[in-house]
Amino acid sequence: GVIYYLLDNQYYFKRDGIYGYYDDAERFAFFSRAVLEMIPYIDFKPDIIHCNDWQTALTPLYYSSMYASSPGYENIKTVFTIHNIQYQGTYGKELINEVLGIPQSATSLIEYDGDVNFMKGAIETANRVTTVSPSYASEILDPWYSYGLDTILNERSWKLSGILNGIDTELYNPETDKDIFVNYSANDFRKKADNKRALQELMNLPQRADVPLIGMVSRLVSHKGLDLVRAVLDEFLGG
C-alpha cells in the first residue's frame, strides 16, 4: 500500500557509483531541491520529509528559506538524520552563488569555518535532528567526536535525539529464516549450535563447541567502535 516516487536525472546520476565525483555538491544540491520541486506534480503533500546525511542536507535549508510559505508547501516538517558526522559535505563558499541559489538571508545558515557545510545547514533548519542511537547523539556533542560541529549541535541540542535502528522481526525470525542453516525457536534453541558449527565450517574455522563465535557487522572505520573491540580482544582471546 506504499507508493514510491523515484527521482532520476541521467546527467547527474547515470554513473557507476553513488558519490565520489568532482560535481557531488552540484548533484546533491540538484536532488535536494528537486525533491521539493516535484511535490506539486505528484499530487501528494508530505507531513514530514526525512533527510539522511549530507547528501540530502540541503532540503531542510531550501524548504525553510524558499518554500515554507508557498501554496501547497505549508506546515511540512523536516527531520535530518546523521548517520556519520565525519562526512559533512564541505565545499568552498563560491558554491553559494555558482550552484546553490539560496537567498542571501540564508547564507549564514550554511557557512561554517570559511566554507559551505551542507550538514550544518540541515542542523540549523530541520525541525528535528536524529542520529542512529542515543549514545551517538550524546557523543557528537563532544568536540572529540563531532568533527567541528559540536558548537552548533550543543546550541541545537533541544531538537537532537538518537533512535536505534529496528529490524524486521518477520524477516529475521529464526523459526522461518531461509538464510540460516537450521531453524530454531526460543523454546528450542539447542539447534542454534548447528548453525554455529555450519558457520565455522563455511569460514574454514575449527568446529569447536567450546570456542565462542563472535560476529560484528560493520565497516572497518573508527566510528563503528572497532577501538572498543580492540580494547577487549586480548581478554577474549585469553579466555
Kindly give the residue locations of the regions a language model identified.
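Catalytic cores of nucleotide-sugar-dependent glycosyltransferases that transfer UDP/GDP/TDP-activated
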Residues: 1-239
